[in-house]
Swiss-Prot record:
The Gly-rich region is probably involved in binding calcium, which is required for target cell-binding or cytolytic activity. The three transmembrane domains are believed to be involved in pore formation by the cytotoxin. The gene is apxIIIA. It is found in: Secreted; Host cell membrane. The chain crosses the membrane at residues 248-265, 275-334, 372-418. Its main location: secreted. The keyword Transmembrane applies. This is RTX-III toxin determinant A from serotype 8. Does not have hemolytic activity but shows a strong cytotoxicity towards alveolar macrophages and neutrophils. Belongs to the RTX prokaryotic toxin (TC 1.C.11) family.
Length: 1052
């Protein structure tokens, strides 16, 4: 006979034997259940329809003659049952006694009758009298003030809940009538529920023993595949972590005592094969020292009945148990303790600063971890039992009833655990809340505000180096620093857990004073009238007697008041809604008589209102109104609308410190100097500081708290039409944003800085000073004596009519002037194009390959060894007297030659392609222009005239040393003197430097002199001297320039 045939025969034999055993067990069970029922058979059959109707409901049965006045809240129990929808049935005592006798429920308050699941009122009443502690355990979440009725509801609904778990899927009405395994299961579940409730009530503190069990569990799990990390974390749970001295451990220990007692293995003599078949041996190997068993009744009657113990079956059991254990559940347990430890360490610092809220939060997570560890460990053990049993009975004919039975009982216990967890966690949270109430009653202060105070003290300690440096950074004697302590997650979490979110604010603002690198502990005398009221939006530092910085160190929430209300939105859900009554502006009164700096860049001026597809993001704007004093002030603006009244002095407004949007600065309608309207586009990629409403969620078991609060974020506005509008009064100088800005000057003097971005600056009328700064900018001076500085980038500078000073800076720039004035054109680095006008111009190409065109008038060109390949094209008149100054060349180092119609000069040390100066069309005849440079002067003052060169090239048109064409005067002082006169006349007139006064420009004279010095010293002849004078007023005279020329010539 083949192996396969043998296996089939053996399987058939085993199946027949199992069938006989099952029938035998069924007959015994049926006979046992029918015992005592025969006397009530007619009543049971007559109640068949009632059973179908009420078989899955819980009924509170009360004898009609029972005296509830002697019980413990008996009438409260009746009322609670009615409120919960549980049927209350009054019956004759004889009828009740028959039911008790027939179904074996005489000594229990919970049982089965033909009515279904039944709570027997007298037994329940007596039980509550005997075990009053059960009311405290199950009802601890309700607090001391809750009525007896509510406690009774909690007790009955709890029993109802756990019964629903264990009896799910069981058709009780059929089970009661027909008997069989389902009825046995139901009876066992009800019996165990009664036993557990009783044991929980009588529980004692066994928490220390449980600590050891968790640690042993961790050691065993560490060796299990894939669970090593979990095991190591569980071993870190020390005995102190589960100390019975903590909050709420009286409840936890009672629960553990009852559950572990229910799992005591009564049949210690059960065979090893029986344990293996049931899955207990393997589950013990994985779970460790936590006892997992069921009653001897279940073990003897079900699990030992013919279950396979072969190797494949054992492997199936092992794998099923492994899947039943949830590593994530134990990681959550360990995370609770780790979070408690983490917050506890964090709390130590703030406890020293006067706030112990973090310690309370740590205690909560410590106790929540204890509760979670208890319930998770036991639930995992239950899962292992159920999984092992199901796997072991997979091939048995009696497997389905066994699996159903064990699953039902483990589900019942899990239901009790889950029902008990929420009251325990709420009990812990309530104790913490009481501590907060006691503190507030003692100190008369908001507990959570005290937490913000402690956070701010820590901020001052941590940021002292930065905060104390602001005086020096902003060049003021004193700093008034405003800091917003924003929403704190730990403080918010504590408020949520304790249900006190309505007593919490979104943060708190603080004012601190720094002087000479020190924090002033008390408000200085001259700040006696400092006002900072974030609820009204008022700031006043007008009484300051020193130069002062007003700075918002961190983003400041919009002004206004907050209110909160906590409401319940579900069975376990609560939300604390925030209502903000905001102000529409900040009003700042600045220092009266001293210069000050106002850094508003962290002022939040947009509060988010709503979002829609059609309109995008919508905001409530808070306008800034700032009244400055009579000193020289600096104002750094934020992204919202502003109204600046600068007062006397030279005042500067900055838009470049933060993202302030695309600017259009318009002074064309100004009737007085310093008045501008500014429009700012805040759409597109512009990022703004906006105030938003956020929420923080915290959980206490099933209870979830949502707290709304104000916070801020730096983000794109999300509104294509969002704009800001500024009005500037008495502002002398404006620095643009880092985007593409447009400046429209007034008819008065304007001082504009483009900052970053490709900007358009138009000075219009007036003697303007325009700075392109970074980017490819276009600067137009228009009418007036203007100063134009291109800065970095490829810029276009148009001086217009008047005496203008143009400096291209780095990049490939184009410089052009109009009219017949005196102009200075400096190319700087890069390949530049310089176009003079009909007047007398100074053209200095600087480094790079430049093109210089002087136009009409007597122009002055500069060339040096670092200039690169330059081309000069002078289209002047025959009466012009143009000059070329070779700043660091002597004639004996230069070669000159005629190339086509051009005169070419280059150093005899350079190649043909580098360091070449070409004077275009020098030799061209027959047109109306004079393309010659009338005089060429070297660094020694030796002079070469156009006539000399013309005569020589007629006779010997070849390359030769330029010295051969020069006049014989060596280092002729008179030649240098004529250069001094030319330069002095151009420089002192260009850009109106010569009449610059403090009241008109506000530009530091030393800075202007530095710019002039750059022009002069670019010719090496002038490099060893500086313009004299450091005060304001008229710049140095021609004699100073003469001295420079003479000294440098002699030095050469």
């Amino acid at each position: 006979m083949s192996t396969w045939s043998s296996m089939l025969a053996d399987l058939k034999k085993r199946a027949e034997e199992a069938k006989r055993q099952a029938k035998k067990g069924y007959d015994v069970t049926k006979n046992g259940l029918q015992y005592g029922v025969s006397q009530a058979k007619l009543q049971a059959l007559a109640a068949g329809k009632a059973v179908q109707k009420y078989g899955n409901k819980l009924v509170l049965v009360i004898p009609k003659e029972y005296d509830g006045s002697v019980g413990n809240g008996f009438f409260d129990l009746v009322k609670a049952a009615e409120e919960l929808g549980i049927q209350v049935k009054y019956v004759n005592r004889n009828e009740l006694e028959v039911a008790h006798k027939s179904l074996g429920t005489a000594d229990q308050f919970l049982g089965l009758t033909e009515r279904g699941l039944t709570l027997f009122a007298p037994q329940l009443d007596q039980f509550l009298q005997k075990h009053s502690k059960i009311s405290n355990v199950v009802g601890s979440s309700t607090g001391d003030a809750v009525s007896k009725l509510a406690k009774s509801q909690t007790i009955i609904s709890g029993i109802q809940s756990v019964l629903g778990t264990v009896l799910a899927g069981i058709n009780l009405n059929e089970a009661i009538i027909s008997g069989g395994s389902e009825l046995e299961l139901a009876e066992a579940g009800v019996s165990l529920a009664s036993e557990l409730v009783s044991n929980i009530a009588k529980g004692t503190t066994t928490i220390d023993a449980f600590t050891t069990q968790i640690q042993n569990f961790g050691k065993l799990v560490e060796n299990a595949k894939g669970l090593g990390g979990v095991g190591r974390q569980l071993q870190n749970i020390s005995g102190s972590a589960l100390s019975k001295t903590g909050l709420g451990l009286d409840i936890i220990s009672s629960l553990l005592s009852g559950v572990t007692a229910s799992f005591a293995l009564a049949n210690k003599n059960a065979s090893t094969s029986t344990k293996v078949a049931a899955g207990f041996e393997l589950s013990n190997q994985v779970i460790g020292g936590i006892t997992k068993a069921v009653s001897s009744y279940i073990l003897a009657q079900r699990l030992a009945a013919g279950l396979s113990t072969t190797g494949p079956a054992a492997a199936l059991i092992a794998s099923s148990i492994s899947l039943a254990i949830s590593p994530l559940a134990f990681l959550r347990v360990a995370d609770n303790f780790n979070r408690s430890k983490e917050i506890g360490e964090f709390a130590e610092r703030f406890k020293k600063l006067g706030y112990d809220g973090d310690k309370l939060l740590s205690e909560f997570y410590h106790e929540a971890g204890t509760i979670d560890a208890s319930i998770t460990t036991i639930s995992t053990a239950l899962s292992a039992i159920a999984a092992g049993t199901a796997a072991a009975s997979a091939g048995a004919l009696v497997g389905a009833p066994i699996t159903l039975l064990v699953t039902g009982i483990t589900g019942l216990i899990s239901g009790i655990l889950e029902f008990s967890k929420q009251p325990m966690l709420d009990h812990v949270a309530s104790k913490i809340g009481n501590k907060i109430d006691e503190w507030e009653k003692k100190y008369g202060k908001n507990y959570f505000e005290n937490g913000y105070d402690a956070r701010h003290k820590a901020f001052l300690e941590d940021s002292f180096s930065l905060l104390s440096s602001f005086n020096k950074q902003y060049e003021t004697e004193r700093a008034v620093l405003i800091t917003q302590q924003r929403w704190d997650e730990y403080i918010g979490e504590l408020a949520g857990i304790t249900g006190k979110g309505d007593k919490l604010s979104s943060g708190k603002a603080y004012v601190d004073y720094f002087q000479e690198g020190k924090l002033l502990e008390k408000k200085p005398d001259d700040f006696s009238k400092v006002v900072f009221d974030p609820t009204k939006g008022e700031i006043d530092i007008s009484n300051s007697q020193t130069s002062t910085l007003l700075k918002f160190v961190t983003p400041l929430l919009t002004p206004g008041t907050e209110s909160r209300e906590r409401t319940q939105t579900g069975k376990y859900e609560y939300i604390t809604k925030l209502v903000v009554k905001g102000k529409d502006k900040w009003v700042v009164n600045g220092v009266k008589d001293k210069g000050a700096v106002y850094d508003y860049t962290n002022l939040i001026q947009h509060a988010h209102i709503s979002s829609s597809v059609a309109r995008g993001e919508e905001y409530r704007e808070v306008r800034l109104v700032s009244h400055l004093g009579n000193g020289n002030d600096k104002v750094f603006l934020a992204a919202g609308s502003a109204e600046i009244h600068a007062g006397e002095g030279h005042d500067v407004v900055y838009y470049d410190k933060t993202d302030t949007g695309l600017l259009v600065i318009d002074g064309t309608k100004a009737t007085e100097q310093g008045r501008y309207s500014v429009t700012r586009e805040l759409s597109g990629a512009t990022k703004i500081l906006r105030e938003v409403i956020k929420n923080q969620k915290s959980a206490v078991g099933k209870r979830e708290e949502t707290l709304e609060y104000r916070d801020y974020e730096l983000t794109q506005s999300g509104n294509s039409n969002l704009k800001a509008h500024d009005e500037l009064h008495s502002v002398e100088e404006i620095i643009g944003s880092n985007q593409r800005d447009e400046f429209k000057g007034s008819k008065f003097r304007d001082i504009f800085h483009g900052a970053d971005g490709d900007d358009l600056l138009n000075g219009n009328d007036g003697d303007d000073i325009l700075y392109g700064d970074k980017g490819n900018d276009e600067l137009r001076g228009d009418n007036g004596n203007d100063q134009l500085y291109g800065g970095e980038g490829n810029d276009k500078l148009l001086g217009g009519n008047g005496n203008n000073y143009l400096s291209g800076g780095d990049g490939n720039d184009e410089l052009q002037v109009l009219g017949n004035g005196f102009n200075v054109l400096r190319g700087g680095k890069g390949d530049d194009k310089l176009y003079g006008s009909s007047g007398s111009d100074l053209l200095d190409g600087g480094e790079g390959n430049d093109y210089l065109e002087g136009g009409d008038g007597s122009d002055f060109y500069v060339y040096r060894s670092t200039s690169g390949n330059h081309t000069i094209y002078d289209q002047g008149k025959s009466s012009d007297l143009d000059k070329l100054y070779l700043s660091d060349f002597s004639f004996d180092r230069l070669l000159v030659e005629k190339v086509d119609d051009n005169l070419v000069l280059r150093s005899n040390e350079s190649s043909h392609n580098n360091g070449v100066l070409t004077i275009k069309d020098w030799f061209k005849e027959g047109n109306k222009y004079n393309h010659k440079i009338e005089q060429i002067v070297d660094k020694n003052g030796r002079k070469l005239t156009a006539e000399n060169l013309g005569t020589y090239f007629k006779n010997a048109p070849k390359a030769d040393n330029l010295l051969n064409y020069a006049t014989k005067e060596d280092q002729n002082e008179s030649n240098l003197s004529s250069l001094k006169t030319e330069l002095s006349k151009i420089i002192t007139n260009a850009g109106n430097f010569g009449v610059a006064k403090q009241g008109n420009t506000g530009i530091n004279t030393a800075a202007l002199n530095n710019e002039v010095n750059k022009i002069i010293s670019s010719a090496n002849t002038f490099a060893t001297s500086q313009l004299g004078g450091s005060g304001m007023g008229t710049l140095p005279s021609t004699n100073v320039n003469s001295m420079m020329l003479g000294n440098l010539a002699r030095a050469a």
